[in-house]
Amino acid sequence: MSRGIIIIGSGFAARQLVKNIRKQDAHVPLTLIAADSMDEYNKPDLSHVISQSQRADDLTRQLAGEFAEQFNLRLFPHTWVADIDADAHVVKSQDKQWQYDKLVLATGAAALVPPIAGRELMLTLNSQQEYRACEIPLRDAQRVLIVGGGLIGSELAMDFCRAGKTVTLMDNAASLLASLMPPEVSSRLQHHLTDMGVHLLLKSQLQKLEKTEAGIRATLVSQHSIEVDAVIAATGLRPETALARRAGVVVNRGVCVDSYLQTSHPDIYAIGDCAEINGQVLPFLQPIQLSAMYLAKNLLGGNAPLKLPAMLVKVKTPELPLHLAGETQRRDLSWQITAESDGMIAKGMSGEGQLRAFVVSEDRMKEAFALLKTLSV
């Protein structure tokens, strides 16, 4: 008798995998176990909740029970998995255990919080649950410090500014989106945020946070300090690998998987923000959607290696939206930038004259798909 497939996690990756499995097999036993409520919400919406005056509960799209009924699943919400016995094919919580034929880790990633004095005063916005815990102080805060000038930090800075709050955006780097693109490309967004009223503290490092009568005092390594009402950590994500380690599978930055999404144990797989696919962590929606399609086939007896095409990453900054693709972080590319009032096209060219990366903004985003076709991957 088939013991079926167990998926640990309930986020976008887990749900996409369930849908793809059920397209091919309506009856294989499917069990989902997760520490949260398992209600569905759209995680990218977290970048816009403040300007749109949304409460955490407004983000819910489908209740867990409806999802279970629609896709013929067993769900175990609010359940912490304590251990995995890979040899016995058993998943254990404090008071239950489940046997499986195939196990999928879809445990996601946790928000990184800088290890500074007063770090407990920092808020994170990496899940509906985290937003629910801090929505009142964030709604009431007038002065907000966002630590981290990457994708999420830039999106949140624009959103909080659009909501009428006084926003300071801090980063160690000399420019925004520094891990994604060179400053000559990100400068358009940087200037726009400044024009909106966002105060940028670049080449700056936070030293400590202290509670005061007036709110929170943030002190920089330079000893400069600012008073704010709320501090948000947007310094990146750390793949959740603790369960994989307990199961004895190989872990690096994320849970190491091959092109079949298979870990070092033949019956354990990983997908989504927790997975490191052939050395790459890809915490974006499109790679997860494609991973779910291929993994569903492989869990049901197929042997299909994941093939990822050139893909767009969208920066959700509505007043100056950006699309990027390719190896935008490469430092050896020569950038050809055309900037006009209706938008920007920046092309990253290799020494051989090949298009290796591009960034487009505003009305020039309509040219992204044509550029994708000419991108060398």
UniProtKB/Swiss-Prot annotation:
Its main location: cytoplasm. InterPro entries: FAD-bd_OxRdtase, FAD/NAD-bd_sf, FAD/NAD-binding_dom, NO_rdtase_NorW, Rbx-bd. GO terms for molecular function: oxidoreductase activity, acting on iron-sulfur proteins as donors, NAD or NADP as acceptor. It catalyses: 2 reduced [nitric oxide reductase rubredoxin domain] + NAD(+) + H(+) = 2 oxidized [nitric oxide reductase rubredoxin domain] + NADH. Its EC number is 1.18.1.-. It holds the Pfam family Rbx_binding. Pathway: Nitrogen metabolism; nitric oxide reduction. It is an enzyme of class 1 (oxidoreductase). The keyword Cytoplasm applies. One of its GO terms (cellular component) is cytoplasm. Keywords: Cytoplasm, FAD, Flavoprotein, NAD, Oxidoreductase. Its cofactor is FAD. It is found in: Cytoplasm. Belongs to the FAD-dependent oxidoreductase family. HAMAP family: NorW (MF_01313). This is Nitric oxide reductase FlRd-NAD(+) reductase.
